[in-house]
């Protein structure tokens, strides 16, 4: 990148159950209306992004990038903040960190770690797919 194109926004802090914060297209429109040029997508929030699908489908990745582009936005990052923290959790913090995990693996540190590693791997693959769509 030879120049900064403008401000980006991390969507996780705004995602919610009410419009315009409950779908990727609507939250992109909202961000663009505020003057943002890029969005960082939280990969753990299925209201906005299906991480597994993005890791398996170039068409879905193209759709996500296209939706952002329709609003004059670029996908700047796929965030794995929460999943990444769960890759290696000290036993003293098991209870505190368990809430970040998928409900199916809570209370099982080994399953939680395997889930987290898989999530990060999916994000790596999805990120490669998204990059194929970005000019």
Which residues are covered by each model-predicted region?
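N-terminal pre-domain/capping segments
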Residues: 1-132
């Amino acid at each position: 990148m030879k120049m900064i194109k403008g401000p980006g926004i991390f969507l996780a802090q705004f995602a919610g159950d009410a419009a315009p914060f409950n779908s990727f297209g609507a939250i992109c429109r909202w961000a663009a209306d505020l003057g943002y040029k890029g969005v960082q997508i939280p990969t753990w929030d299925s209201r906005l992004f299906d991480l597994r699908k993005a890791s398996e489908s170039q068409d879905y990745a193209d759709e996500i990038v296209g939706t952002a582009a329709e609003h004059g936005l670029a996908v700047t990052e796929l965030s794995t903040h929460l999943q990444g923290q769960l890759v290696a959790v000290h036993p003293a913090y098991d209870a505190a960190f368990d809430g970040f995990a998928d409900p199916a693996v809570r209370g099982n540190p080994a399953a939680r770690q395997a889930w987290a590693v898989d999530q990060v791997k999916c994000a790596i693959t999805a990120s490669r797919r998204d990059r194929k769509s970005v000019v």
